Swiss-Prot record:
The modification N6-succinyllysine is found at K88. This is Small ribosomal subunit protein uS8. SUPFAM superfamilies: Ribosomal protein S8 (SSF56047). Pfam families: Ribosomal_S8. GO terms for molecular function: structural constituent of ribosome. One of its GO terms (biological process) is ribosomal small subunit biogenesis. The keyword Cytoplasm applies. Belongs to the universal ribosomal protein uS8 family. PANTHER family: 40S RIBOSOMAL PROTEIN S15A (PTHR11758). Keywords: Cytoplasm, Nucleus, Ribonucleoprotein, Ribosomal protein.
């Protein structure tokens, strides 16, 4: 079976493990985009540490869960988002204001929407978590 979107698979498995109350989840295959997305989530405290396991194939990631994550998901297709349109996306995705993060891929790297606003850059929307 061919995987169409490895980021969507990874976020869905994190979501399911979090709902079941698991402490750890194994994600495979590993990719740079998944690692950067998890780094943004870890920076905000939604997940614990994660460890990349190199098995000389596609690699695996073991993520420690903290129980703080409510939902995470991918936005497909990766829409172009200008700085002024971020507010609309926040209203559509999140249950309330000042709550949750949109992850963007920009020319300055993968970051959350608040950092993109500080750096004054738009980009393509990857996903969200809250």
């Amino acid at each position: 079976m061919v995987r169409m979107n490895v980021l969507a698979d990874a976020l869905k498995s994190i979501n399911n493990a979090e709902k079941r109350g698991k402490r750890q989840v194994l994600i495979r295959p590993c990719s740079k985009v998944i690692v950067r997305f998890l780094t943004v989530m870890m920076k905000h405290g939604y997940i614990g540490e994660f460890e990349i396991i190199d098995d000389h194939r596609a690699g695996k990631i073991v993520v420690n869960l903290t129980g703080r994550l409510n939902k995470c998901g991918v936005i497909s297709p990766r829409f172009d988002v200008q700085l002024k349109d971020l507010e609309k996306w926040q209203n559509n995705l999140f249950p309330s204001r000042q709550f949750g993060f949109i992850v963007l891929t920009t020319s300055a790297g993968i970051m959350d929407h608040e950092e993109a606003r500080r750096k004054h850059t738009g980009g393509k929307i990857l996903g969200f978590f809250f």
